[in-house]
């Protein structure tokens, strides 16, 4: 007994599935989680505990939780900026989220500082400018060049066709 505590709900966020690229794989895994949440709700009800809130869902999975009939709220938030890693996640039509359902809202402007090495350019956006804990950035609107590595202050861009010039903006 804890008279000052009120049980108000469940937190059922499945964080490790948020960045699963394949839509069908995410759905399969979320269906299993939703089933477990239903079992938990049934158990709570059988014990006389009301569960008004079931919270969970994220940018990569909210459609599954929202349509489950089990969750009362979703916690998606990364969609507001749509980072590159969430952008790589595929929707039900097999398209990247950042090229279908969501659009990028936050960008980093970088300049090319060097093109001394054939097939490679150096830009001024490294680790001090961006986070790479969920993968390297994607160069917006450019499928012909690829950001391949970075140090504290510089990024390396693969430019196989040697198109980039010093002071080009990306």
Regions flagged by a language model, labelled:
Residues 82-164, 169:
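Charged (often Lys/Glu-rich) extended helix/loop segments that serve as interaction or gating elements
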Residues 1-95:
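Active-site loop/helix belt of alpha/beta enzymes
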């Amino acid at each position: 007994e804890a008279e000052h505590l009120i049980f108000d709900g469940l937190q059922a966020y499945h964080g490790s599935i948020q960045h699963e690229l394949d839509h069908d794989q995410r759905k399969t895994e979320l269906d299993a989680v939703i089933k477990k949440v239903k079992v938990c709700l049934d158990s709570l009800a059988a014990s006389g505990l009301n569960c008004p809130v079931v919270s969970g869902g994220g940018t990569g999975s909210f459609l599954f939780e929202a349509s489950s009939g089990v969750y009362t709220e979703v916690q998606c938030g990364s969609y507001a900026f749509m980072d590159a890693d969430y952008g790589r996640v595929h929707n039900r039509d097999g398209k990247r989220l950042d090229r279908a359902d969501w659009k990028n809202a936050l960008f980093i402007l970088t300049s090319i500082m060097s093109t001394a090495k054939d097939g490679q350019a150096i830009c001024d956006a490294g680790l001090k400018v961006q986070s790479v804990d969920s993968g390297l950035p994607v160069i917006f609107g450019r499928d012909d060049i690829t950001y391949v590595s970075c140090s504290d202050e510089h990024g390396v861009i693969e430019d196989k066709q040697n198109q980039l010039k010093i002071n080009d903006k990306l």
